[in-house]
């Protein structure tokens, strides 16, 4: 019995030492990984915005699909959309786990937040030209998108399709104002000029 107890104590002691050593060995690696960005005074890494997508990718990946959710709510009452067989994997936001009017609200807020992505320095248009954030009209056009998104959000909160019709009209105007100037060019190389 004494041998079993001694063996047990030895195993616990060895396990504790191993755990402590492993913890100390991982601490510098974790600290180094956490410090990938510059650390602030509080020791928290600071992050800077990074631009990875071009303007076309941003439009196709965020603005276009979220605008379509709002446009879809003009014709079909989101409250009447049946959930998908598996809402967690639904490709239609209106039939997803966060569907119905909530999907319209979320899409509107995605447009509002995406406006911030349109003013980040360093983004390129699909043709390689810089996004014209320095042009005097660009901030107004981006603000028009932001306001259209907020209008759509309020309309979605009201759960009223007449309000969505008006919000969609505001959104169409905001999109057209920018597209008419910077996108609708016969030659791709002339976009963003």
Predicted regions and their residues:
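Positively charged n-region of N-terminal signal peptides that target proteins for export
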Residues: 1-5
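Bacterial N-terminal signal peptides
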Residues: 7-18
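Boundary at the C-terminal end of the N-terminal hydrophobic targeting segment
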Residues: 20-25
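Extracytoplasmic c-type cytochrome modules immediately beyond a signal peptide or single-pass transmembrane anchor
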Residues: 27-170, 184-193
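The canonical Cys-X-X-Cys-His
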Residues: 171-182
């Amino acid at each position: 019995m004494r041998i079993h107890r001694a063996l047990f104590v030895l195993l616990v002691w060895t396990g504790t030492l191993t755990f402590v050593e492993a913890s100390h060995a991982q601490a510098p690696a974790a600290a180094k990984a956490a410090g990938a960005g510059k650390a602030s005074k509080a020791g928290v890494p600071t992050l800077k915005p990074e631009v990875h997508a071009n303007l076309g990718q941003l439009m196709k990946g965020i603005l276009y699909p979220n605008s379509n959710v709002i446009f879809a709510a003009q014709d079909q009452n989101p409250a009447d959309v049946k959930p998908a067989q598996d809402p967690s994997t639904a490709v239609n936001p209106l039939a997803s786990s966060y569907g119905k009017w909530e999907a319209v609200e979320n899409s509107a807020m995605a447009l509002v937040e995406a406006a911030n992505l349109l003013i980040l320095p360093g983004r390129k248009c699909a043709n390689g030209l810089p996004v014209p954030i320095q042009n005097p009209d660009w901030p107004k056009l981006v603000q028009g998108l932001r306001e259209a998104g907020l209008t759509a959000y309020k309309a979605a909160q009201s759960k009223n399709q007449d309000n969505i019709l008006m919000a969609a009209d505001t959104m169409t105007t905001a999109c057209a104002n920018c597209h008419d100037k910077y996108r609708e060019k016969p030659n791709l190389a002339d976009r963003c000029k």
